[in-house]
Amino acid sequence: MSGHSKWATTKHKKAVIDARRGKNFAKLIKNIEVAARTGGGDPGGNPTLYDAIQKAKKNSVPNDNIERARKRGAGEEAGGADWQNITYEGYGPNGVAILVECLTDNKNRAAGEVRVAMTRNGGNMADPGSVAYLFTRKGVVTLDKNGLSEDDVLAAVLDAGAEDVNDLGDSFEIISEPTDLVAVRTALQDAGIEYDSAEASFQPSVSVPVDLDGARKVLKLVDALEDSDDVQDVYTNVDIPDDVAAQLDAD
């Protein structure tokens, strides 16, 4: 899940990845296949493919799985589905806005699974455009602090188009326009700074703070959505205050 809260974007995301390693592998593999099909099979000339491969490697996806996905997408090897990108919009508990990005070979199945997850967990589907306007597409690069200060990171990426550097506790998050994502990632590499992930993401323009009960309900809905094999990413505008995050940590 991606949202406004430090806790929601770090601890919860890692917990979901740990709990659903197999599903996550499949989703990362799909990203590689689609990136290779769209922009060609050479990571050197296809930044989206490069970043998809890097993300898969950092999540311990075996190299031969990565290479087979790249070959399928590039047409060098038979197989591969006709993946389609679809975005669904909805509202969760407490009026939290939700965007659900799917990558599927069956639109009807994807729509059905998203709808069921929403309705069973206090959410409801919304008309196209009625939620999307609350989010802006941005480039997001995350990296562990590893002794770096915010100024160290800013100095490396400011001239590359970085708009903001957010302190997430154990890590930094660099925000840019999606078109500057490759430049920001390259600037970090040139400065000898390792990063965790670099991808286009939806950032909320307005956030909705929730109490403990609201946070639990929203996260339960996000978990249900992410359980679907067709769902790649879930974005929300939930803001989980620090005191609520501390209570969630204690659960």
From Swiss-Prot:
Chief location of this protein within or outside the cell: cytoplasm
Family indicated by similarity: Belongs to the TACO1 family.
GO molecular function (one): DNA binding
A single GO BP: regulation of DNA-templated transcription
Subcellular location: Cytoplasm
Alphabetic keyword roster: Cytoplasm, DNA-binding, Transcription, Transcription regulation
The protein's name in its UniProt record: Probable transcriptional regulatory protein Mflv_3828
One Gene Ontology cellular component annotation held by this UniProt entry: cytosol
Source organism, top-level taxon: Bacteria
Disulfide bonds, paired cysteine numbers: none
HAMAP family, sorted: Transcrip_reg_TACO1
Record has Metal-binding as a keyword: no
PANTHER family, sorted: TRANSCRIPTIONAL REGULATORY PROTEIN YEBC-RELATED, TRANSLATIONAL ACTIVATOR OF CYTOCHROME C OXIDASE 1
